[in-house]
Swiss-Prot record:
SUPFAM superfamilies: Tetrahydrobiopterin biosynthesis enzymes-like
Binding-site list for substrate: L78, E79, S80, H97, E98
Species in which this protein is naturally found: Rhodopseudomonas palustris (strain TIE-1)
Keyword NADP on entry: yes
Subcellular locations according to the entry: Cytoplasm
Main location: cytoplasm
Name of the gene: queF
Gene Ontology process terms (BP): queuosine biosynthetic process; tRNA modification
InterPro entries: GTP-CH-I_C/QueF (IPR043133), NADPH_dep_7-cyano-7-deazaG_red (IPR050084), QueF (IPR029500), QueF_type1 (IPR016856)
Residue numbers annotated as active site: C56, D63
Keyword line: Cytoplasm, NADP, Oxidoreductase, Queuosine biosynthesis
Name this protein carries in UniProt: NADPH-dependent 7-cyano-7-deazaguanine reductase
Catalysis: reaction(s): 7-aminomethyl-7-carbaguanine + 2 NADP(+) = 7-cyano-7-deazaguanine + 2 NADPH + 3 H(+)
Purpose: Catalyzes the NADPH-dependent reduction of 7-cyano-7-deazaguanine (preQ0) to 7-aminomethyl-7-deazaguanine (preQ1).
Length: 158
């Protein structure tokens, strides 16, 4: 049984359930939001992107990261297909690790206006040095449990 995609005031044209082209750069990517049916309840939502890629802005070589995005929703939830497309748009985007991580966190916060958001960018080593980048919007609401992001410190092959 096929359903017609629902449209909402939040995202009148959701990408979910539609054939869409992959955005070629982050600025062209659309992040969709949907109403939060539990907006009066504090809870944590987590997205994990273990195979995030972007390009070094100097060498053009690929960089790889494990991203963990935690947020306490306000009136909106982040729609996961649009997040996948947004993150994939960085594949041919040249930026330093810090810029990619913080820009992603800020863009999501702007779009969905969460009560709290944190992003951890765990970048795989280039030149022998892993870079971990963390950004958050402010104080976590007191009644929310936030588990550890679960990414072990890089230990090499040994």
């Amino acid at each position: 049984m096929s359903k017609t995609p629902r449209k909402s005031a939040a995202s009148p044209s959701l990408q979910l359930g539609q054939a869409v082209e992959w955005p070629d750069r982050p600025e062209a990517a659309k992040l969709d939001r949907v109403p939060n049916p539990q907006k009066d309840t504090h809870f944590l939502a987590r997205f994990t992107a273990p195979e995030f890629t972007s390009l070094c802005p100097v060498t053009g070589q690929p960089d790889f990261a494990h991203l963990v995005i935690d947020y306490v929703p306000g009136p909106w939830l982040l729609e996961s297909k649009s997040l996948k497309l947004y993150l994939a748009s960085f594949r041919n985007h040249g930026a330093f690790h810090e810029d990619c991580t913080v820009a992603i966190g800020k863009r999501i916060a702007t779009e969905i206006k969460p009560k709290w958001l944190r992003i951890g960018g765990y970048w795989y080593p280039r030149g022998g040095i892993p870079i971990d980048v963390f950004w958050q919007t402010g104080k976590l609401p007191k009644d929310v449990w936030v588990p550890d992001q679960g990414v072990q410190p890089y230990r090499g092959r040994g």
